[in-house]
Each structure stands twice: as C-alpha cells, then as structure tokens.
C-alpha cells in the first residue's frame, strides 16, 4: 500500500536551472514570464524612465507630444504614435532622420554619422536617439545640416 502511494506523487512545479551568467533568482524570472514582462538585461527586471518628447514638424509646424521610454528610440515612439517622420537606414549612418534638439537631452551614442560640431549645433538622428529627459525636437532638418 505504501508503494502505491509513492508512485502517485507528482511534482507540482519544477524550477529549471538558471544560467550562472544571468545570476538571477528563478522566482523573479518566473514572475516576469508569468506577467509577460520582457527585459534586455538577461532576465533581470529593470525600471525605465519615460519622457515626453515633443516633435515640431519643420515643414508643417505641427506639434506632437509622445511618451517615450529611455529604452526606445524617439523615431520608434513617433511611429508608434502614428507620426510619419523621414528615415532611411535606421542605424544612425545617414542623415535622413535628422532633427535639431531645441530643449532637453538625448543619448545618441549609437550614431556614426554626425561629427562633433553637428552634435554641438543640436543635430540629432532620431532613428538612434534615446531620450534622456523631456525634450523638444525640430524634425525634417536634413537640408539644414
């Protein structure tokens, strides 16, 4: 009788080993997956800042304000909001998406096109710019570079 009882025991849950590289408790990874959360940081959940990015259309004068996390390129946030901004390479290697920062700060360390003087003049490549504060960007500025 005791043998029959032991064969009917089934584990309710098993925890898969976690990579030593990730150095994350399995419970936090499980909770993240259960809620559908995703992270670029190898399973660790991180907080991200969200900023208001105001786009001033250099051609029409239209103004659009978009919420953008510090882990999203401002061009992607604009497109998510339904805006149609110019772009070409989406890699920071051309000037199609060029804008001018009128206020605030961005991290555009992924870009490889602008030289230091253009950056000092406020030029930004929206396809590879993360907001670092609330900011105002004048768009459609490739012709003014």
Curated annotation (Swiss-Prot):
[2Fe-2S] cluster binds at residues 89, 94, 97, 127. PROSITE patterns: 2FE2S_FER_1, 2FE2S_FER_2. Residues 1-48 form a transit peptide. Its cofactor is [2Fe-2S] cluster. Keywords: 2Fe-2S, Chloroplast, Electron transport, Iron, Iron-sulfur, Metal-binding, Plastid, Transit peptide, Transport. The keyword 4Fe-4S does not apply. InterPro entries: 2Fe-2S_ferredoxin-like_sf, 2Fe-2S_ferredoxin-type, 2Fe2S_fd_BS, Beta-grasp_dom_sf, Fd_pln. One of its GO terms (cellular component) is chloroplast. One of its GO terms (molecular function) is 2 iron, 2 sulfur cluster binding. Residues 51-143 form the 2Fe-2S ferredoxin-type domain. It is found in: Plastid, Chloroplast. It holds the Pfam family Fer2. Gene3D superfamilies: 3.10.20.30. Its main location: plastid. One of its GO terms (biological process) is electron transport chain. Binds 1 [2Fe-2S] cluster. Ferredoxins are iron-sulfur proteins that transfer electrons in a wide variety of metabolic reactions. NCBIfam families: fdx_plant. Forms a complex with heterodimeric ferredoxin-thioredoxin reductase (FTR) and thioredoxin. Belongs to the 2Fe2S plant-type ferredoxin family. This is Ferredoxin, chloroplastic. It comes from Physcomitrium patens (Spreading-leaved earth moss).
């Amino acid at each position: 009788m005791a043998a029959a009882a032991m064969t009917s025991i089934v584990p309710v849950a098993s925890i898969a080993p976690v990579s030593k590289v990730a150095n994350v408790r399995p419970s936090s990874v499980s909770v993240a997956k259960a809620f559908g959360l995703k992270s670029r940081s190898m399973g660790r959940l991180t907080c991200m800042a969200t900023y208001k990015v105001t786009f001033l259309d250099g051609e029409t004068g239209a103004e659009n304000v978009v919420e953008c996390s510090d882990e999203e390129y401002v061009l992607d946030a604009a497109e998510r909001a339904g805006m149609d901004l110019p772009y070409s390479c989406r890699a920071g290697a051309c000037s199609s998406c060029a804008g001018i920062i009128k206020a605030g700060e961005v991290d555009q360390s992924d870009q490889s096109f602008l030289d230091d003087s253009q950056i000092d003049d406020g030029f930004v490549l929206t396809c590879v710019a993360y907001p670092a504060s609330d900011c105002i960007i004048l768009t459609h500025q490739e012709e003014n570079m």
